[in-house]
Amino acid sequence: MKNILFATSEAVPFIKTGGLADVAGSLPKYFDKRYFDIRVILPKYACMKQEWKDKMEYVTHFYMDLGYKNCYVGILQMEYDGIKFYFIDNEYYFSGPKPYDSAPWDLEKFAFFSKAVLSVLPVIDFRPDIIHCHDWQTGLVPVYLHDSFQQNQFFWGIKTIMTIHNLKFQGVYDVKTIKELTGLSDYYFTPDKLEAYKDGNFLKGGIVFADAVTTVSNTYADEIKTPFYGEGLDGLLRARSNSLRGIVNGIDYNDFNPETDINLSARYNATTFRKEKVKNKIQLQKDLGLEQDPKAMMIGIVSRLTDQKGFDLIAYIMDELCQDSVQIVALGTGDERYENMFRHFDWKYHGKVSAQIYYDESMSHRIYAASDAFLMPSLFEPCGLSQLMSLRYGTLPIVRETGGLKDTVEPYNEFEGTGTGFSFSNYNAHEMLSTIRYAERIYYDKKREWNKMVDRAMAKDFSWSNSARQYEEMYNWLIGE
């Protein structure tokens, strides 16, 4: 039996701010239980729902040094979906109204968490063969493991993997502060270790000291070795390219299933979508005050409204796009200027554009089901889960060829009759517009071709079991079997 510990700052269903929670919470249950004992460790935030906190059972507590402090470390545990979750408790660090705050407070909080992850292992009597760390919040786990923990035989031979979900977030602050917070010696603050451009960098420490580095799609693994996508760490990632690989994320096919989804007004599957899918569109048009036209092409957008997601392109061509016979439904929150942009177009083209400036899981499912196409023109996209959800619901993605979007959406080829969506390659508003208009043409003039594409999209398998097989293979390679 191989023991694997996921160290993460968030995991569904306990706490979620982004895609990292989906990976850490959903992936573990898809491993082969005969060969892998997967457990997850995360902080016990005060902002978790009370129903989860009530189910956690206290294991023990102890005190641990961190820099110049002596910190309380409480351990709680519970089982969910057959997976054991451990929670690190410390009210000083984890009592805020949300999981993340601002540097340097977050850095101290996750330096504490990284050290606590290692400190609790002998206490809970679980010795992992591999500690799988996720994003900068756990970047110091491989560093601490390499440092003082080597004095204890228990930790000898434990391997670490660093998974980068988004390279943009690295956990950076000045060296003096990080040295004080972490209690690490000067040895670690050189340009070949934790120092990057005169600052201390948590993620860099993780990448340098981990035994293997992964990211969440093949294309993104290649892209981050270039200056444009590398966020200042491209040189290091090129140096580590032998142990860097991309494994595409999946989605939970039980949660996202148009045949059983309770949020939909009409459920459907790959054989019934031609008749049933449109009923969701009619209902959504009614509920959102759009013109009720079952034949109108509806384009869905469900996203954080930020620069990364390509909303400057959408802003640029929105007036032109609204001259076409399309309807646009957007759901999400984010930068104020993009929120206001969608509010403006909702007002200007009322009946064609609907801006839902909030986030609601049930509404997102309804948009995936009701839309004909799903727009996702990201500037960069490590993996992206929305396009996988839209494929699952038979809604064809229109994407920019970057990161996970390039790996998961096969562009339509009308001569070969292949493809599961539409794509464009340059970050250019009119290139995006012409791709949308090409999709409109297929939708209105070649409906049979469109439906065949929906068939292919719904037949794709991006469930977690696919990703789990690739992770298992990597664990075996790292353990040496």
Show which residues each predicted segment covers.
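Catalytic cores of nucleotide-sugar-dependent glycosyltransferases that transfer UDP/GDP/TDP-activated
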Residues: 1-481
